[in-house]
UniProtKB/Swiss-Prot annotation:
Designated name of the protein: Phosphoribosylaminoimidazole-succinocarboxamide synthase, chloroplastic
GO terms of molecular function: ATP binding; phosphoribosylaminoimidazolesuccinocarboxamide synthase activity
Pfam families: SAICAR_synt
InterPro entries to which the protein is assigned, alphabetical: SAICAR_synt/ADE2_N, SAICAR_synthetase_CS
Main location: plastid
Family classification: Belongs to the SAICAR synthetase family.
Underlying gene: PUR7
Organism placement in taxonomy: Eukaryota, Viridiplantae, Streptophyta, Embryophyta, Tracheophyta
Amino acid sequence: MAQCVRSTLNPVRTPQSFTRKAYVKSPAFASVSFLRAVPEFNKYPKPCSLVMSCQGKAQNQQEERPQLSLDDLVTSNRKGEVLGTIKDSLSNCLSETNLLATVPGLKSRIKGKVRDIYDAGDYLVLITTDRLSAFDRNLASIPFKGQVLNETSLWWFNNTQHITPNAIVSSPDRNVVIAKKCSVFPIEFVVRGYVTGSTDTSLWTVYNKGVRNYCGNELSDGLVKNQKLPANILTPTTKAADHDVPISPNEIVEGGFMTQAEFDEASMKALSLFEFGQGVAKKHGLILVDTKYEFGRSSDGSILLIDEIHTPDSSRYWLAGSYEERFQKGLEPENVDKEFLRLWFKENCNPYEDEVLPAAPAELVTELAWRYIFLYETITGSRIDIIPTQEPIHDRISRNTSQALSSLRQL
């Protein structure tokens, strides 16, 4: 299996289709395990311990850290520790939710590709499921994927509060966050540090066609695929039907999507978040290549970070140690993502046209679950609690969400 996985680690990657959610704010967290007073989230280190510019011991530790390699992914002892739990959980994934039937006070549900959003009056409840989405459809359910995505975002939300306030009120369950409602800007702030990608709207695709002004960014001649840009750039998109449409800052303002002041503030936040994320990723042997952010305005007028941040579903990560050598040789960067499973579906069916798709092999589902865990633990420097349970995840989520909402309504 290791050899099979290793041979498919780095196919040409198609950037994710970034999905928009309508949700909200908050400057503070509860415990990941259950809603405690609301403002405490002590699981993770302070932001300054993660910033590349921190001096002294943290910087020395960074310099001494061995380079991350594919061997760490394929032969890690940690992989052996979690594989059994992953396999035991293949039949207990969170594929669908129906909290309208199990949690009092919920009014409606919006089902997204991965997240289900419930209206709870003053709050929204966001459930991150284990669904794997690609080719504009769900391909499989991956054990612990929802938990890993949720806790990855929580970790980043917690450690970027010095840059921007965010949408989270509490996290009463490993798959759940509760947020206050706000008015969501219909723009996705895509930030890129490299010329890469293969979809119609990716930077390399449009650049290779001769485009030298993309979303208001002037691009010089002579760039090659996967090259690092002289500076990070913002390439916003807006939603039209089911696809992203690139848009320039002038078009955003002239089209009434945002005011100039709103766009300027959100842009500054997005670029600052990306720079911070690159520093954290570099510290842990990774390159944060590109990502997307979404923002909304709260009832008090503040611009808040919403949705998710720097997850493996919304971001592209490469291995830093081998990047330069592979770039010089014209090879694709080594990466850690879901592309190998996408490739399996493309080789075994037509995922765009076939009405019924084959079931993903259990060994590939297990491998992808491990990759999500690996990326979380690599970025955060801490182990995620992967707890096997016989209790259906939906029952646990319903119980914890009900208790959390009841506590919030009493505040």
